[in-house]
Amino acid sequence: MAKAKFERTKPHVNIGTIGHVDHGKTTLTAAITKVLHDKFPDLNESRAFDQIDNAPEERQRGITINISHVEYQTDKRHYAHVDAPGHADYIKNMITGAAQMDGAILVVAATDGPMPQTREHVLLARQVGVPYILVALNKSDAVDDEELIELVEMEVRELLAAQDFDEEAPVVRVSALKALEGDPKWVKSVEELMEAVDASIPDPVRETDKPFLMPVEDVFTITGRGTVVTGRVERGVINVNEEVEIVGIRPETTKTTVTGVEMFRKLLDQGQAGDNVGLLLRGIKREDVERGQVVVKPGTTTPHTEFEGQVYILSKDEGGRHTPFFNNYRPQFYFRTTDVTGVVTLPEGTEMVMPGDNTDISVKLIQPVAMDEGLRFAIREGGRTVGAGRVTKIIK
């Protein structure tokens, strides 16, 4: 296989198909892989519909999600594409972040127009911070009436605008089924769709370009050298002799300097996103720092105790609660590396939340946690995961 050597030369982008069930998300995913395989045979494998539809189960933060990953390349980019076939799977994926998306293809059947799930998916995409959506008007071969298809296009644009997405986003008329059958007109439509994806979904900001952050997993003392904190660098880069702050869990933030970076017992000049490293910290005692805090570039992250979040609560079958919960529910919220107890306030008019529901909640934590909007967490009771969510708004 001539696959490996292309990997690093192109920008890598994560995308996914979203939209109402039966509008053809999975068929379109299969059509994209086939069309790109035929166009760039040395870069791509073709994937049949049933290979994608029989999505393997994944566990993310204790929640089982059926999700398919395929990869393919255009001449400009390398794509990782996720397709969550079921509606519930899609919702769970979006909230738990099993697959982050840099952009999404909203699939709308030209024969139906936007449906309730179409709206729900676009709303969720907005809430979880998907940066860009463009549209594939699928089954366009089945609509002869030009006015009808223009009406559907207008409706979809209004839907995007209502959630602050680009109203002028490309809307490409496709037929996934006809493209899979090799009909030249519709093969070309899928090629045009991918050209639009290349052109309209912005290049993602690489993790290494973001400000440095490392969650503390462990702390120990090296005699004669000082205190070392270990963890996996979440984002950014850390160089020896750079100043950092230790944030969260405790009321005050501590400033210090990184005097050494090691990985696999070797000293490095630098640690970067994805590395598991130990950081030697100047003038810090073993008891000054603990698991659950984060080491960050000064001034980039602040600790908070009150936030609003969007959560998915596991059903009984998924190993979740057997009973609903009410206002003032007090579980633990697992952020990055540690549990912090919090009190839940339900939205006005919501009396209780049932297992299997997704809902918005307000939370007041008993200790501050370093957080930004978009940070994901698990909800646990005595170490057992009962839900997952993400921070949508910081209150205090």
From Swiss-Prot:
Function text: GTP hydrolase that promotes the GTP-dependent binding of aminoacyl-tRNA to the A-site of ribosomes during protein biosynthesis.
Name assigned to this protein: Elongation factor Tu
Catalytic activity of the protein: GTP + H2O = GDP + phosphate + H(+)
Cell location: Cytoplasm
Residues annotated as binding Mg(2+): T26
Region spans: G1: 19-26
PANTHER family reported for this sequence: ELONGATION FACTOR TU, MITOCHONDRIAL, ELONGATION FACTOR TU-RELATED
Ranges for domain tr-type G: 10-205
Region (G2), start-end ranges: 62-66
Region of interest: G5: 175-177
Classification via InterPro entries: EF-Tu_GTP-bd, EF-Tu_GTPase, EFTu-like_2, EFTU_2, G_TR_CS, P-loop_NTPase, Small_GTP-bd, T_Tr_GTP-bd_dom
